[in-house]
Structures are given as C-alpha cells and as structure tokens.
Amino acid sequence: MIDQYKHQQLRIGPVSPQQIRAWANKILPNGEIIGEVTKPYTFHYKTNKPEKDGLFCERISGPIKSGICACGNYRVIGAEKEDPKFCEQCGVEFVDSRIRRYQMGYIKLACPATHVWYLKRLPSYIANLLDKPLKELEGLVYCDVFSFARPISKKPTFLRLRGSFEYEIQSWKYSIPLFFTNQSFETFRNREISTGAGAIREQLADSDLQIILNNSLVEWKELGDEEVIGTGNEWEDRKIRRRKDFLVKRMELAKHFIRTNVEPKRMVLCLLPVLPPELRPIIQIDGGKLMSSDINELYRRVIYRNNTLTDLLATSRSMPGELVMCQEKLVQEAVDTLLDNGIRGQPMKDGHNKVYKSFSDVIEGKEGRFRETLLGKRVDYSGRSVIVVGPSLSLHQCGLPREIAIELFQTFLIHGLIKQHVASNIGIAKSKIREKEPIVWEILQEVMRGHPILLNRAPTLHRLGIQAFQPILVEERAICLHPLVCRGFNADFDGDQMAVHVPLSLEAQAEARLLMFSHMNLLSPAIGDPISVPTQDMLIGLYVLTIGNRRGICANRYNTYNCRNSQNKILNNNKYNYIKMKATYCCSSYDALGAYRQKRIDLDSPLWLRWRLDQRVIGSREVPIEIQYESLGTYHEIYRHYLIVRSVKKKIRWIYIRTTIGHISFYREIEEAVQGFCWAYSYVI
C-alpha cells in the first residue's frame, strides 16, 4: 500500500469487509460486479481451462496469457485504440498475465467465522478484550453452547435478557429446540439467541475500547489498594496479582486497537480473502498429472461447506435448527484449517496421510514466504560479523572492521586511488590494496565519510530491523554498535551477528540518509512508543555512575574508603579502621573533572561543588545538620545535600552541593545534548 506521502509500505492486520471487496471487485462494461468466488472448482477436466467463478477464474484473477481472453481473442495491451478493455463474451480483462500474482478474490461466508489467530493463539486477543475465559468462548464459537446476547431488534425482548452470556443452564441446549416448532424457533433464535462467531462479533461490535480502558484502569487501581493492604490469604493474593497482570495486558491491547484505528469486530470474518492464483499454483508434471498447492484444497473445503450452509439457510423453514448450527461449526472449522492447520489439535491430512500446509505454514518460519523468499537471499556488497558495544559512538554511527570495510568499499576505493593519481590503473590499485599501504586507509576513510551502510539483524520482523549508519573504521574484528539502537534490532551483545550492506545507487543512498538513519527512527512504527531507550548495559552503567559512595553529610564524615586528595588520619575504634576525611571543594565541574583525571579523587567520592544561587535552596526551611564557624567570622551551614557559606553579615556568599564525579559527568552529557538539540532546532527555524 502507499500512504499519503507516497511511501510504499506493508501493513499486516485485521481488514474490514469493505476493504476486501475493494481489493477484489471489478465492474464489467455491462455493470456486473465480479470478484466473489462461489464455486469450488479449479480447471475443467476436458478443456483444462479455469472454471467460471471458481478458484482460478480468469474473470476474477485476470487472463492466464497476456492479452488473451478465455475465448481466445487477442488484443494488444496498452493500445491507444478505443477498444473495450473487457471481452464482451467472457468478461475477461485484456491485461498482462502478471495481474494473477496480486489480483485477489473473496468468499462471502454464510455465517461469520472468527479468525483463529486472534482466538486460539496465546494470549487470545478476543478473550482478553471480552474478559471471558477462552474455554467458554470456544464453546460459543463452535456452537456447543448458546449465548443470550443483545437482540438485533430494538423491541422489548422475549426473555428480558440483554448483553450477557449464559453458559450455566446446559439443558436449554436441548429443551429449547424441542419446545418450539421450527419456524417459531427460528424467530426466537434470530431475536434472542446468538451462537457461533456471530455472538462474538456482536459482543465485539458493542465494545467501547475507551470504556474498556477506563474500567480496567479503575479495577487495577482498586486491586492495587487491596494488594497493599493484603488479605492474609496467599491464594487470594496470588489471584489478585494474576488479575492485575491480566488487566495490564487488556489495557495494552485496547491501546493498540485505539492507536491503529482498528475495530475489534474485524477479528471475526464475514468475507474470506482468496489469494491470487499464482501464489497457490497448479502445475502439470510428467505424465499429465497435476500438482496443486495445499491451500487450493483447503479453499475448496471452505467453499463446499459454505455453499451447503447457504442452501440450508435458504430452506431453513424445513430444516432443524441443530442441523444449521452443526453446518456453521463445519464452516468455522474449515476456515480454521485454512488459516492455521492443527491449531485446534489434530491437523487435517490428505489421502497419503500428509498434513496440509495452511496459510500460516506458508508464511511462518525460516522456510516461510517472508524469510526465505523475500529476506533470505545472498547479495553482493554485503558481509557479516559479531556485534559488540561501542560506547564512544554517536547514535547514527557504527564501527566497521577494517577487513570488512576494505572488501565492501573496494570498488569505490579503486576509483579513489585512480582519481587521486595514486594508481594509474585497476591492477596497480588492487596491488596497493593488498599491500594495505597507509594511503589506502586515508582514502578509505574519505570514501566511507560520504557513504552510509545498512545493518540488518535476522529475523527482520519490522522495518527497524534494517537501519542505516555512518561507518567508522575500527581495529577490532567485530561490528561496534551504539547500545540505544539494540531494541529496534532486538539485539544484545551475547554473540549476536549482523549483516552489513552497501547501498550502491544514488536513490538507495538518498533513502538511507533520509528515511533509514538510526537517529531518525526513535519511535516504534507500530504504536508510536519510544524505541531508542536505555537497556541492559546502559542502565547498569548509569547506575554505577550515579550511585555514589554514601552520599550525605552524616555518612561521609567518617568513611571506611580511602580518600586521596587530603591528609587522612587513621583512627582505631572497636577494632575497626576509620579514616577521617577532609572535604573536597571544587569551584566548577572542570576543576572536579581535572582532579579526577589527576587521580586525586575517585569516581564515586563525595565532594562539594560550587553551584549557582538557587531560590529553592535559599527559601528552604530545612534545618542545618551542622554549622562550622571560621576565625574570620564566616561560617558554613551544612545540610544533607548542600552547603551554604555566609559572610559575617549573614549574606550568602556561595552555595555548594554534595555530589560525585559520576553525577557531574552525567549532568554535563545531558546538558550538552539539550543544548545541541536547541541549537539544531533554532537553526531549522
């Protein structure tokens, strides 16, 4: 699909019936709308031509041969003549046969069918959204129980039951069909009783996502208060924790539906899309035998059962209601097998006891459509190596080993050597590269400075699995990566490998610079949450950097750790050695960092740093812990985390804060980042 900015993109998610019709429907010159597959046939056994309205129908999917209709008439594709685009006899469009790779059809289901991915996969999205046990929903979907759901009509209901599930009275399942006549039971069933996937669809259609979000949040807060108080019963406390975890998942699911603007009722199918014929082919092999994709057989199974249900509903006045519900169950099972064979237990097999490959089997795993066909090809100008952390790199940079860089950029390097008259021809340039002369590395750095590279970590599950970086030459044999980009790749530094690709064309380089650079992909494309966040190594480093060594004036007057910047006196008290420290005073952060570089203080050693006058400190009502007077009349008011130096006239001369070198370094990094952002923002404006 193409968005409003003309960017090609792939979006996977529930689709509305209107969108499925828009994908498949075509209007013939006579006004007939085609696109629905109604027959379970593929090719005629005598003519070997696709059956009309079947799974390989040329009217729906396009011609088998370019420009030739089913009648055999030929017309030049793209001719400027005002000839009709469709054949008047067979209704086949005169287009290229490649249309059969993307032109879809659809099956209009006689009854709604739940999408098995959203019902049976764990966690079950439908069960979480409706707050119902999965076992009860399965009984409802597969017509094992009834549901007294909200009636379709707005008139008073027969039993005065609205918007609630009933599973307790199992005898109704047998008593109601026997009590009513067929016609009366049909009227009662359509008005009062909802069963199958239709009941799920009604419940999902009536669900307000914002109300679900608010109610779940209120319940989560109430359970949090109960958990703090405690019930005294371990079993009840465990139930509360499980319920809280469930509510968190339910709120996250509701947020995802709201952000992506997807209606929950789309998880129940009314129209079943039919894949293009070229993606589920029938091939003729030696001996005249045919080999068909398993998906064709599964589609035929769905159409057979769906047509049977349509006939039963057309004559429902003479058909028992239980027979109709049994056929609805068969349709639901056929749709489940098509989407994910074996997800409900025993998979469906053919006559040779071989399991059918469903749609899920075709696209998932290493041998699936995405990973094997689209993402699993080996290409030139690519390499692979282990990734390690690069703490000195910027967010948009990556460290590229020399051995990999000199191979990937060899073509550009040869061009640079010849252009700068270092080599007269390609042979001499290659010999200089093999000898690895110093001039080679200088030109290589110039080439890499203007050429981005692409890093990819398999499996590429979303677009952040491939990002662009500015390469930097490193001496190591591993690729150095900034730790902030690891979450987008779902990577860590325990032996993961990444592939390196070089974009060659100007269009690819422009796309890498404008769209794929790592500093331009800070938010998740799915839900909009920040994805470049500190994790693992960075969190541990920040913790060690800012933990300090017993910060606070009381804990630091006598410290068991060594202090290098002052004269220390060792005191023996109760067989423990204490060191009486002289406080370290620094006029600025530069003085503090200089003292650290000279190894006069440690990274976590507490010190007093002169700070700007802060009205919050001046107006504070905190009582000083200690007051120290000097011989000239000045005195120090020492508080827990700051110190005020006053003159004889009690005026504030300086304010010192209690901090460490780690805090100072962290603060300066944040300050420089904010200033750089403000400068860049003002430059853009």
Swiss-Prot record:
Principal place of residence: plastid
Entry annotated with the keyword Glycoprotein: no
Family: Belongs to the RNA polymerase beta' chain family. RpoC1 subfamily.
BP terms from Gene Ontology: DNA-templated transcription
Protein name: DNA-directed RNA polymerase subunit beta'
Gene Ontology cellular component terms for the protein in this record: chloroplast; DNA-directed RNA polymerase complex; mitochondrion
Pfam family, one: RNA_pol_Rpb1_1
InterPro entries registered for this protein in UniProt: DNA-dir_RpoC_beta_prime, RNA_pol_asu, RNA_pol_N, RNA_pol_Rpb1_1, RNA_pol_Rpb1_3_sf, RNA_pol_Rpb1_clamp_domain, RNApol_RpoC1
Function: DNA-dependent RNA polymerase catalyzes the transcription of DNA into RNA using the four ribonucleoside triphosphates as substrates.
Ligand binding (Zn(2+)): 69, 71, 87, 90
Subcellular localization(s) per the UniProt record: Plastid, Chloroplast
Cofactor(s) listed: Mg(2+); Zn(2+)
Subunit structure: In plastids the minimal PEP RNA polymerase catalytic core is composed of four subunits: alpha, beta, beta', and beta''. When a (nuclear-encoded) sigma factor is associated with the core the holoenzyme is formed, which can initiate transcription.
EC number: 2.7.7.6
Catalysis performed (reactions): RNA(n) + a ribonucleoside 5'-triphosphate = RNA(n+1) + diphosphate
Keyword terms of this UniProt record: Chloroplast, DNA-directed RNA polymerase, Magnesium, Metal-binding, Nucleotidyltransferase, Plastid, Transcription, Transferase, Zinc
Top class in the EC scheme: transferase
